[in-house]
A protein has these predicted regions:
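Terminal targeting signals and extreme-terminal segments of soluble enzymes
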Residues: 1-166
Length: 166
């Protein structure tokens, strides 16, 4: 790991600082016999986008620990451009929740349709490959504060489902 001071590593960051949109054109190898893109392809794109966002925020490697609330709203068709938009919604001590929104764009018309939404949770790893603290979020807007509060509620729900307390 490069030499970055602990103060710099743990300095608060805004959700916008790590937000990302990834795109990928859907080819025949991504689809099933009906011409719909396999759900696993969409999940992989979401995980890649979310992992990059979490690592950007933590300035550390981050690994997936939970895939939460994946919604398949509409099929993604072969030949569409998939856009995966992600941003951090909540952070804990070493955990980072990323909110993901997937759209499919028809290249000839420019029409975009939301196809998926999901929350993925990552844990930042230190040099010893163990969970390590992450920077807090700078919550500058009412929207940031709302997302954080909703993320905190999802975190508590995940802990309750696992039989643990916050």
């Amino acid at each position: 790991m490069s030499q970055i001071s602990a103060e710099t590593l743990l300095a608060p960051r805004s959700p916008d600082a790590s937000a990302l949109t990834m795109t990928m054109f859907m080819q025949p190898e991504h689809s099933n016999s009906l011409g719909n893109v396999h759900g696993g392809v969409i999940l992989k794109l979401c995980d890649e986008c979310g992992g990059i966002i979490a690592s950007r925020h933590a300035r550390r490697p981050a690994v997936t620990v939970t895939v939460d609330r994946v919604n398949f709203l509409k099929p993604v068709l072969l030949g569409r451009l998939v856009l995966v938009h992600g941003r951090i919604s909540w952070v804990g001590r070493s955990s980072i929740e990323v909110e993901l929104r997937v759209e499919a764009e028809h290249l000839l018309t420019g029409e975009r349709t939301q196809t998926n939404s999901a929350y993925f949770v990552y844990v930042a790893l230190g040099d010893d490959r163990r969970p390590t603290p992450v920077p807090p979020l700078l919550l500058a807007t009412d929207e940031d504060r709302r997302r954080f509060a909703e993320g905190e509620a999802r975190h508590r729900q995940r802990l309750a489902e696992a039989g643990r307390s916050a």
